[in-house]
């Protein structure tokens, strides 16, 4: 089956699964998992988001189902890599699902503690990167840098350690960044569609050994997020929850590792990077200077505080993500 046809098929699998299954999932979630509007030390946010209370959450399970289905239908079942990806998909989905379950049981809406979640994410990332590094062999030391091209690291333990660390950081960092971005109706889902389509172009341009697998994953994620966006756009009828955001970020990071293009995430996931930087700057400034840089973080909440309508913020952030991806694509062909 031609690779391009498989990628298109993966996109439509994700799209159709989301469009068909999200609607009944909305009804099912109303029986259990619902969003909490409690925000620590953010009474204004609680008022702004009071209309979001009791909206079904954890809808991101759709993404997990879509990816597993695509992998089983489009990749050879006699290869270890197929079952490795199925396992990674289920484990990353399980992390977010467990977090949403705990949030639902607690009145204040807190899930796993930040330290425990970070520890589990690192364990999952290490368990994901190690088999990829072994499969790549010495080729794992080759990395694609924006505007530069392929760079080969020294063939020594330091080179492997650096490559391994960057890969783990890319997965964990992207997972948390998408999680931070998921704060407004349609923001994370729409941004993921743009990011995944951008990474698809990188896939065809680089042609890494695992490019076909990465293409199938990215196309499925793009289609699934697009279908989910129909129900998640303002006013949202369902939220992806941590089940969706942690999973989407983790899978986007894994795709970058498969392509040996972790640094391309700085552009392809530009809006996610900006959201994370806003939180880092805010926390750092509060601790060191006892002052805030933003009215509230992540960045999208800052503009909510300034009085911008939610739809305007989401639309503008999508535009920023599109521009970042455009720069990233230029960086690919320039290098």
Curated annotation (Swiss-Prot):
Q: Quick one: where is this thing mainly located?
A: membrane
The molecular function terms of the Gene Ontology recorded here are:
metal ion binding; phospho-N-acetylmuramoyl-pentapeptide-transferase activity; UDP-N-acetylmuramoyl-L-alanyl-D-glutamyl-meso-2,6-diaminopimelyl-D-alanyl-D-alanine:undecaprenyl-phosphate transferase activity
What InterPro entries does the database record attribute to this sequence? Glycosyl_transferase_4 (IPR000715), PNAcMuramoyl-5peptid_Trfase (IPR003524), PNAcMuramoyl-5peptid_Trfase_CS (IPR018480)
Q: Known catalysed reaction(s)?
A: UDP-N-acetyl-alpha-D-muramoyl-L-alanyl-gamma-D-glutamyl-meso-2,6-diaminopimeloyl-D-alanyl-D-alanine + di-trans,octa-cis-undecaprenyl phosphate = di-trans,octa-cis-undecaprenyl diphospho-N-acetyl-alpha-D-muramoyl-L-alanyl-D-glutamyl-meso-2,6-diaminopimeloyl-D-alanyl-D-alanine + UMP
Q: Family, per the entry? A: Belongs to the glycosyltransferase 4 family. MraY subfamily.
Per the UniProt record, the source organism is: Chlamydia muridarum (strain MoPn / Nigg)
Its transmembrane ranges are 2-22, 55-75, 77-97, 118-137, 153-173, 193-213, 238-258, 263-283, 313-333
| HAMAP family per the UniProt record, alphabetical | MraY (MF_00038)
Q: In which pathway does it act?
A: Cell wall biogenesis; peptidoglycan biosynthesis
For membrane topology, the record states: Multi-pass membrane protein
Gene label: mraY
Quote the protein name from its UniProt record.
Phospho-N-acetylmuramoyl-pentapeptide-transferase
Keyword annotations from UniProtKB, A to Z: Cell cycle, Cell division, Cell inner membrane, Cell membrane, Cell shape, Cell wall biogenesis/degradation, Magnesium, Membrane, Metal-binding, Peptidoglycan synthesis, Transferase, Transmembrane, Transmembrane helix
Q: Which domain of life is it from?
A: Bacteria
**Subcellular localization, per the record?**
Cell inner membrane
Cellular component terms, GO, for this chain's entry? plasma membrane
What are its cofactors?
Mg(2+)
Q: What is its EC number?
A: 2.7.8.13
Q: What function does the entry list?
A: Catalyzes the initial step of the lipid cycle reactions in the biosynthesis of the cell wall peptidoglycan: transfers peptidoglycan precursor phospho-MurNAc-pentapeptide from UDP-MurNAc-pentapeptide onto the lipid carrier undecaprenyl phosphate, yielding undecaprenyl-pyrophosphoryl-MurNAc-pentapeptide, known as lipid I.
What biological-process GO terms show up in the record?
A: cell division; cell wall organization; peptidoglycan biosynthetic process; regulation of cell shape
């Amino acid at each position: 089956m031609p690779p391009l046809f498989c990628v298109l098929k993966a996109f439509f699998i994700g799209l159709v699964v989301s469009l068909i299954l999200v609607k009944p999932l909305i009804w099912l979630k109303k029986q259990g998992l619902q969003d909490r509007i409690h925000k620590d030390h953010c009474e204004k946010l609680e008022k702004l988001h009071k209309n979001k209370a009791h909206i079904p959450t954890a809808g991101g399970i759709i993404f997990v189902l879509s990816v597993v289905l695509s992998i089983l239908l489009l990749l050879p079942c006699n290869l270890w890599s197929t079952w490795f990806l199925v396992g990674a998909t289920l484990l990353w989905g399980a992390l977010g699902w467990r977090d949403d379950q705990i949030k639902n049981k607690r009145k204040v809406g807190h899930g796993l503690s930040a330290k425990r979640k970070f520890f589990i994410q690192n364990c999952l990332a290490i368990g994901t990167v190690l088999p990829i590094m072994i499969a790549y062999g010495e080729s794992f030391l080759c990395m694609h840098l924006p505007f530069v091209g392929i760079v080969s690291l020294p063939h020594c333990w330091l080179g492997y350690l650096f490559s391994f660390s960057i890969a783990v950081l890319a997965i964990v960092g992207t997972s948390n960044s998408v999680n931070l971005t998921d704060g407004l109706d349609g923001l994370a889902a729409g941004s993921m569609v743009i990011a995944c389509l951008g990474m698809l172009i990188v896939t065809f341009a680089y042609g890494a050994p695992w490019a076909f697998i990465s293409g199938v994953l990215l196309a499925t994620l793009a289609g699934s997020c697009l279908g989910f966006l129909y129900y998640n756009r303002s006013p949202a009828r369902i939220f992806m929850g941590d089940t969706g955001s942690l999973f989407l970020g983790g899978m986007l990071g894994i795709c970058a590792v498969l392509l040996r293009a972790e640094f391309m995430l700085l552009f392809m996931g530009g809006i996610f990077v900006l959201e994370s930087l806003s939180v880092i700057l805010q926390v750092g400034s509060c601790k060191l200077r006892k002052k805030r840089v933003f009215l509230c973080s992540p960045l999208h909440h800052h503009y909510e505080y300034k009085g911008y309508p939610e739809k305007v913020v989401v639309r503008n952030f999508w535009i920023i993500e599109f521009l970042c991806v455009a720069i990233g694509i230029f960086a690919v062909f320039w290098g």
